[in-house]
Amino acid sequence: MTSSAVPSLFRLSFLLFTLQVMNIGRIGAATRFYQFKVQTIRLTRLCQTNEIVTVNKKFPGPAISAQEDDRIVIKVINMTPYNTTIHWHGIKQKRSCWYDGPSYITQCPIQSGQSFTYNFKVAQQKGTFLWHAHFSWLRATVYGPLIVYPKASVPYPFKKPFNEHTILLGEYWLKNVVELEQHVLESGGPPPPADAFTINGQPGPNYNCSSKDVYEIQIVPRKIYLLRLINAGINMETFFTIANHRLTIVEVDGEYTKPYTTERVMLVPGQTMNILVTADQTVGRYSMAMGPYESAKNVKFQNTSAIANFQYIGALPNNVTVPAKLPIFNDNIAVKTVMDGLRSLNAVDVPRNIDAHLFITIGLNVNKCNSENPNNKCQGPRKGRLAASMNNISFIEPKVSILEAYYKQLEGYFTLDFPTTPEKAYDFVNGAPNDIANDTQAANGTRAIVFEYGSRIQIIFQNTGTLTTENHPIHLHGHSFYVIGYGTGNYDQQTAKFNLEDPPYLNTIGVPVGGWAAIRFVANNPGLWLLHCHFDIHQTWGMSTMFIVKNGKKVQESLPHPPADLPKC
C-alpha cells in the first residue's frame, strides 16, 4: 500500500464512524422500524454447502441501532418451514413482556407463513445487546447485534474511540440444528460439538477450506478502538484475545464498568462486553482469536480456535500474522481473574432488606430411559437419558403461551409451586448422589414462583456435581441483577463475602464450576420472565424456571393488554 493511501483510508474510516453516530444522534426519542424476513439460504462453509436459517439472507443477521429511550418496531415474517420467535437479549422490556420472545413462555411461535410485529422501548438502557431466535436451536444462525447508543448530549464515560466494530462470536454446525436438537432428545445422549467457531460468521484459516473465510478489521495506528464483543454461541463459553494488545473492559451486558485491563476475556453465551483497544504496536497484522472455555470433565467440544485479522493500515501483504495466545480450555483461574475485575462504574443501590431468599441448585440429571421401543437404548450414562434441572425440577416446555394463560387466568398449564430451596441438602459439589439412574432422577413440571411487585430478591445459585460440575451461564429475562458474590465449593452464609458497594450489574452470570454465585435484584417489571441456563442443550434438557411479577398499584406498574396480532399456537 502506498503512503498516500493511508490518510485516505484514515479519513474514510473516521467518516463512516461519524456518519453512524450522527444517524442515531438526533435530539429526542425516535421510533425505528425494521423488517426481518426469516428465510433459508444456501451457505458454503468448511467445504460443504448447506441450507441455514437467516434473517434477510444475512449471516450473521442485520444490526439494529437505536438511541436510549427510542422505540423499536420490528415486523418478523417467517418464510421458513420452522416455527420461530425473536428474543431481544438484555432488553428489559419494561411493561412490554409480550414482546420478550421466548417461545411458549411469552408468546406462541410465529408459524410458517405468519408474521408478528415486536414493539418496545429501550427505556433507560444503552449499550451492546443481542437479538436471537428463541425456538429450538435456530439461534445458531439467527442472531445479530442490537446497539443502543447514549443520548446525543451524553458522552461515554471514557475517551471517545476513533472507531468501533462489533464482533459476534458464534458456533457453526454443518447439520440442520432443528433436526440435531430432536435427535439429541430422542437419543437421550449428549450433543455433538459444533463443527467450527466463527468470528462474524467466518471460521478463519485453522479450518478446512477456510483460508479465505477470515474476518478482518482495518486499524489506523495509534488510535483507540471500541470493540463490541457478543457471544452468540449456543453451547460454549469462549475466550477472546488479540495478539500483543491489551483489552480494557468498560461495559458488560449493557452496563458501564470500572475500566479493567487484561490480556484476554471470557464470555458466556448471551453475554456482551465492550472493550477498548489501543493500536500501539508495530504496523502489521495481528490475530484476533476465539477459543473454548470448557470447565466440565469428559465432555466432547470443539477445540480449534477461530481466527480473524486485526490489521494495521500500512501493513505489507507479505507481513506474517502475529499469532494470538489463548488460555488452555479449562483455565478456571483466567475466568475468575476477569470476573474479579468487574465492578460497576459508580456506587449502586444494591437491595439491602431482602423480601425473598431463594437457594437454587443447578445441574445435570440422568433419568431412566423409558424408551417406547425396547430395542432403542438411550445413549446417556448407564443407558439412561440426560436431563437438567433447577432445584431438581426439570422444566417441561408447554405448547401454549404461559404468559397468555397467566393473563387470562387459565388453569392446568402451569403451577405456582417452584421450590425456593432444594428438597434435600447435602454436599452439593462433592457428595452428590450418583447412583445412576436411581437417585439422579429429576421431577418434571412447568412450575413458576410468584413475587409481589417491588420485592427485593436474593438468589444463591449452587452448582452441583451429580454428573459433572461446570460453569453454567444463567440468564434472567426482564431484569438485570447485581452479582454480589461468588466462590468455590458449597455456599456458606457464615463465610461468604458480598460486595454491596459496586458489584457488576448483569443479565447473565456464569455460576462458577464447582461453586456458587449470589445475585440481588428488585422485581419491578410486571409479567412472566424466564430464568434459564443459556447453554441451549441445558435449556432443552430442562434447566429453566419462571418468575411471575404481579402488577403494582399503578398503571405504569401493570402488564398491558396483549397485542392484537399475538401469534396463536
Swiss-Prot record:
Keywords: Apoplast, Copper, Glycoprotein, Lignin degradation, Metal-binding, Oxidoreductase, Repeat, Secreted, Signal. It is an enzyme of class 1 (oxidoreductase). It is found in: Secreted, Extracellular space, Apoplast. Cu cation 1 binds at H87, H475. Cu cation 2 binds at H89, H132, H534. GO terms for molecular function: copper ion binding; hydroquinone:oxygen oxidoreductase activity. Binds 4 Cu cations per monomer. This is Laccase-6. The gene is LAC6.
